[in-house]
Design a protein with these regions (language model features):
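Self-processing/autoproteolytic domain segments and adjacent N-terminal interaction modules in large
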Residues: 54-128
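C-terminal motif of bacterial Sec signal peptides marking the signal peptidase cleavage site
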Residues: 16-19
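Proteolytic processing hotspots in large secreted/extracellular or virion-associated proteins
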Residues: 39, 43-56, 101-154
Length: 193
């Protein structure tokens, strides 16, 4: 009797797994397109890209972008400006770009200024993407002038990576720093290291 109950339970589990898409590592559900009776594939849906509500957002498409245009995205605090230069052919693809201050700042990131660039596609398709930070501080930076770095947060560890720096202006207490920002992620300024 116990064997029959066990067998019935095992078969029920197998049917349930098959109906739910099996035990793959993609969170359940079928991950491959399913064929219907006419032989055409039905694509799987992916989550839509969105910006956090307090970030600034810019949407681009092939039909609305002109060649070699400089487009600016500025945070409400006026400190961060992301300047995107469109390609010479004007073709950007459909693209959403976000700029803002993460709240809260990810654990382990220690910096005086932290801004995040998010993109639904590759910013390397643009002619350039530059982040400029304009701020006033009474802290004496070390090194001076300070620089913008990329904070790579992975596996609970934070690695600060150097970036190609642009023009900077450093006359205390006013600072303007610029750096290439063609990757989605956190851009930071550490006034003291």
């Amino acid at each position: 009797m116990k064997k029959k109950i066990f067998l019935a339970g095992l078969m029920g589990s197998a049917v349930l797994l098959a109906a739910c898409g099996g035990g793959d590592d993609n969170g359940g559900g079928a991950s491959a397109p399913a064929a219907n009776s006419t032989g055409t594939a039905t694509p799987t849906t992916t989550a839509a890209f969105s910006c956090p509500s307090d970030y600034k957002k810019m949407s681009l498409s092939n039909s609305s972008v002109i060649a070699n245009a400089n487009l600016n995205l500025r945070t409400d605090d006026g400190i961060a400006v992301l300047t995107i230069k469109t390609p010479a052919d004007g073709k950007t693809g459909d693209l959403i770009i976000c700029l803002g201050k993460p709240n809260p700042v990810p654990a382990g990131v220690k910096a005086d200024y932290v801004y995040e660039v998010k993109s639904s596609s590759d910013l390397h398709a643009m002619a350039s993407s530059t982040l400029t930070l304009n701020f006033t501080t009474n802290t004496v930076p070390n090194p001076n002038p300070p620089v913008i770095e990329f904070a790579d947060v992975s596996n609970g560890a934070v690695t600060y990576k150097s970036l190609t720096q642009g023009a900077s202006y450093a006359t205390a207490p006013n600072y303007t720093l610029a750096a290439s920002a063609q990757d989605s992620g956190l851009y930071v300024v550490r006034l003291t290291k």
